[in-house]
Amino acid sequence: MNETGETPPQQLARNFNELLQELRVALSGVQILFAFLLAVAFTERYEEASAYIRGIHLVTVILVAISFGFLMAPAVWHRMLFRRGHRENILPIANRFALCGIAFLAASMTGTVLLIAEVAVGGVAAKILAACAAIMF
């Protein structure tokens, strides 16, 4: 028993469930951002976009996809290894994957701010806004 009155397996189950709950929140944001970025490619204005804007967009889409993969992996592992007694091995790795997913999410949010700022104001102001977003994340 620990200070919360849980046995080690109970604490492990709670920690894993808390991680999965946190990932559900992050994944909702990733899915919305991914949908927005996918929709952008099918607008009339996208056809007129410069190679620079298209490059920012493509890199940002890739960053969001990587983020999604990292954030989704712990839930998939949990489902695949459910009731096989591997939680103590999976939890540290799942935590690292979650942190990587959040880092890629921060990079993709910065890319999204840069993309929108380049279209809206362009130039140095766009880079400053993206840098502010990067610092914030």
Regions found by a protein language model. Name each.
Residues 48-137:
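Alpha-helical transmembrane segments of integral membrane proteins
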Residues 1-49, 67-75:
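Cytosol/matrix-facing amphipathic helices and coiled-coil assembly/linker segments
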